[in-house]
């Protein structure tokens, strides 16, 4: 026995180059099962490893099974246990083990390279196995993982003796007429526990050797040889993609072959973690194709473990049908039950991160046939095309998933047909160049399964939100939402999926969310179980808006009949009933009641677009209240218990939330015909109520006698606080933040005085019936105090506004809409940067004012007259506010002489904008010509 030391092995994973035979031999003789990941050198640079004594004699060539002699007729003795132990790295062979002889390492290195080069390199025409150039021409070699595929015909290892790593063929050693077999690249990312031998098209899977009923003892051939017909090479995890189908290709990795005829085959361990059925090796018997090496073969294709729970009963039945009905011809291997078919989303997908779903590329040396049978177990990473918003994804992630229900398989009954929706358009199918994939002759028992599946269909999980898809018909089908130009609502309504079993069986049109079907079976990855009402357990979170009863009806009536039940329209939680006119949960019901009765002034810290769901519904009360008002919740709606009888009048047909707000057209204008239904406050007006500022105090000391300077100073401090309140209110105003930031600042600076005096008139009208000027709770001026002040004439001018409110009996809804229009009533002469958005927003609030008028006026004539009176009041405010601007600017200029204090922010606005306004550099927007 010869004891050698291998020095400086190169990394076997070097792309584009082959490792030296020394490192191949040293790794082949390593410990067979070190763990799931065998340590290896991965860098290009060579690294010095510890000297490993390698016992060549008796380990490189295993003796054939008992009862057979080597070709030269010698009789061999089985190796001692010490010889076998000497093959493990880190274990020194005993000095007297066998008849070993020591050679200097420098002499043995060349001999070892020559022997391993001859042994491991595949033979080819005109090639010498002892030539080092041959090793360089061959693709990089690689090593087996700890778990190898099992060969049922191989003789198992017994009595703790390890199975030999290589098998010597019985044929003459000098035969070199065979050609290098084409090899397949193991997909990258494949875990070591799934490293299986890949089939080579046209190669025999295992030599025709009958399995021995008795365990064969492992014997080692001590004879030296210079040539070997087969090639033994393990698969490499993470090997680069193969560019060609031959072993001579620069990027192709050779595939380890099975045992030669008469040799002891490889007996790897079975991995019990994966119970997926595999094609029996006993059926992979095919003649040797001309020009192929009998050893260049494989066991079975790699297995993709299903990522979803399976119907075990159906899978077992389908596997039994495959095993009983498969046939092989022409040396082509059958398609694995877990191999993706051509045209599947994963067949041509990009590399997937992770080790369970590798990126597979096969050399184009065998084209699969078109009649390959689509199997149930074709699981690949699903190609998901999800166009959902964030709350939809989170709602789906929180929902329990029921993939396959237990029970009878629908495919077992020929008369049972599931209405599978037509799959969405996919990219053109690219035929995969996959060696070893051939047609599978389906048995009669499998015909019922294939009859319910579309040709070439696999697991296609394509969940998409089809905004442009035609709406389906059915009891829960939404009516199409027209574009704004065609007289439709401005709300981004999302359709509800019609997933009832009766609707699908009756052949209804496909839902907007197509169900996930697998060969006509219940869908995977989506709810298969439904509620007793026929509605799915999980709904889309976009159920904020009501659906119209009929598209053809001219009156914009809305009902709850088309809404799903048992789901809160605000947060998506389980609804407890219809509260305040909307189907909500108990939490949202209590929140809305407290928010509306307590008159809280909630402000959003973000952009008024916070997500309101079951988990985050308490984060932002402002957005939650906005969503409640948007859904149509009103305190007067508590009396309506039967939600399928409630009608919401003119609520969602004109103005939309979220932003932007659309421009009205002829078909969208509100008519003033009397309605027979119960009239509720429109949602946008409810939102305006919720964002109305709280009561602001002036901080005036009423215990001291009034002076001109003290009153003006208190009014200036009140104006500063009201100016800050206007800024916060405008930011919460729907549509205002869609404008350019410069336009927002300009509009506030031009309109802050109008908003203050208009609010003064409303407070005076509501609290003191217009008899006094109600500036603040701590600053109320009656007529006597007005006369004592230095601005009595100005007080009389401001007093006209509450008197007009008393005369017209302005409602709160009308006041809120008029207040927004005052913000949008003055623009620069050159216009705004976002002029189109401004006009769109202003037109929308004009229509809101019309709807607010329609809540009280029942006739067209009376409603039109009131609209004229209110808009005339807005026009008259321009002249009144101009007087206030002039007085304010004069007081600001003489502030030191008058001992009047002006706060900083108010001073900046007065100095920057009032001269422009008084100079006529602004353009007032009037409703009526003077």
From Swiss-Prot:
Q: Please list the residue ranges the record marks as binding DNA.
A: 566-640
Q: Where is this motif: LXXL motif 2?
A: 116-120
What is the location of the Glycyl lysine isopeptide (Lys-Gly) (interchain with G-Cter in SUMO) cross-link? 7, 387, 532
Work out whether the entry's keyword set contains RNA-binding.
no
Question: Does the keyword section mention ATP-binding?
Answer: no
Compartments, record wording: Nucleus; Cytoplasm
InterPro entries attached here?
A: NHR-like_dom_sf, Nucl_hrmn_rcpt_lig-bd, Nuclear_hormone_rcpt_NR3, Nuclear_hrmn_rcpt, Progest_rcpt, Znf_hrmn_rcpt, Znf_NHR/GATA
Where is the segment annotated AF2?
Answer: 684-930
Spell out the residue ranges making up region: AF3.
Answer: 1-165
User: Where is the motif named Nuclear localization signal mapped on this chain?
Assistant: 184-188
Q: Region annotation Mediates transcriptional transrepression: residue ranges?
A: 166-304
> Which domain of life, per UniProt?
Eukaryota
The ranges of region (Modulating, Pro-Rich) come to: 1-565
Give the start-end ranges of region AF1: 457-547
Regions of compositional bias (Polar residues) in chain numbering:
38-49
UniProt biased composition (Low complexity): 187-204, 431-454
Crosslink site: Glycyl lysine isopeptide (Lys-Gly) (interchain with G-Cter in ubiquitin): 387
Which modifications occur after translation, per UniProt?
Answer: Phosphorylated on multiple serine sites. Several of these sites are hormone-dependent. Phosphorylation on Ser-293 is highly hormone-dependent and modulates ubiquitination and sumoylation on Lys-387. Phosphorylation on Ser-102 and Ser-344 also requires induction by hormone. Basal phosphorylation on Ser-82, Ser-191 and Ser-399 is increased in response to progesterone and can be phosphorylated in vitro by the CDK2-A1 complex. Increased levels of phosphorylation on Ser-399 also in the presence of EGF, heregulin, IGF, PMA and FBS. Sumoylation is hormone-dependent and represses transcriptional activity. Sumoylation on all three sites is enhanced by PIAS3. Desumoylated by SENP1. Sumoylation on Lys-387, the main site of sumoylation, is repressed by ubiquitination on the same site, and modulated by phosphorylation at Ser-293.
Instruction: Give me the residues that bind progesterone, please.
Output: 763
Q: Where is this region: Disordered?
A: 1-133, 148-260, 334-356, 415-454
Query: PANTHER family from the entry?
Result: KNIRPS-RELATED PROTEIN-RELATED
Q: What is this protein called?
A: Progesterone receptor
Q: Which gene encodes it?
A: PGR
